[in-house]
Design a protein with these regions (language model features):
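Rossmann-fold dinucleotide-binding core
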Residues: 1-56, 63
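Charged, alpha-helix-enriched surfaces in structured cytosolic catalytic cores
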Residues: 4-7, 31, 35, 68, ...
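Alpha-helical structural signal
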Residues: 11, 63-66, 70, 135
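Alpha-helix N-cap/N′ positions at the starts of helices
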Residues: 19, 65-69, 97
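NAD(P)-dependent Rossmann-like dehydrogenase/reductase catalytic/cofactor-binding core
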Residues: 38, 45-56, 74, 78-79, ...
Length: 168
């Protein structure tokens, strides 16, 4: 431990872009006091954020769910279930997600997604978290998403297009 007062230490996981994303995860660990959790909730509220409290586990709640959903969407794309844009539309219209899992993966960075999945697989000793081979292929080719102009989608002048060489 690097502190004499672990009861006063809290983690807060913000989402990018921070000014636009309303959620913050407040990370509870074994030694934290309820007062510290309450102060973190208050701080989040004063920043205009909604907060959830999660235990200190790999991936917390949101990253763990997000990367698994993204990895499954990549699997579906590789299997030819639907095009990338149709998979994303299914989640936007069918589940009211503001952005589909494939577009979000491109925004976050496919390399980041892969690193998180590998970290979860190692932490939980569970190969179900391993990145799909298509994700590995894209990252190894340097197709990392929006930041490189190519990932699941082709990113032109701010517009995205389905790639012809992936899935359908």
């Amino acid at each position: 431990k690097s502190t004499q007062k672990p009861e006063r230490v809290v983690g807060m996981h913000f989402f990018n872009p921070v000014p636009l994303m309303p959620l913050v995860e407040i990370i509870r660990h074994d030694g934290i006091s309820e007062r510290t959790v309450d102060i973190a909730k208050y701080a989040a509220d004063k920043m205009g954020k909604s907060s959830i409290v999660v235990n200190d586990v790999p991936g917390f709640a949101t990253s763990r769910l997000g990367v698994v959903l993204g990895n499954e969407a990549i699997r579906m794309l590789a299997e030819g279930v639907a095009s990338a844009s149709d998979i994303d539309t299914a989640m936007k219209l069918g589940y009211r997600h503001p952005m589909g899992p494939l577009e979000l993966s491109d925004l976050v960075g496919l390399d980041v997604r892969r690193d998180i999945l590998n970290g979860l697989a190692e932490s939980f000793e569970d190969d179900s978290y391993r990145p799909h081979p298509l994700l590995n292929r894209l990252v190894d080719a340097g197709d990392l998403g929006r930041k490189t102009g190519r990932g699941i989608y082709e990113w032109g002048t701010g517009e995205k297009r389905d790639r012809d060489d992936l899935g359908m």
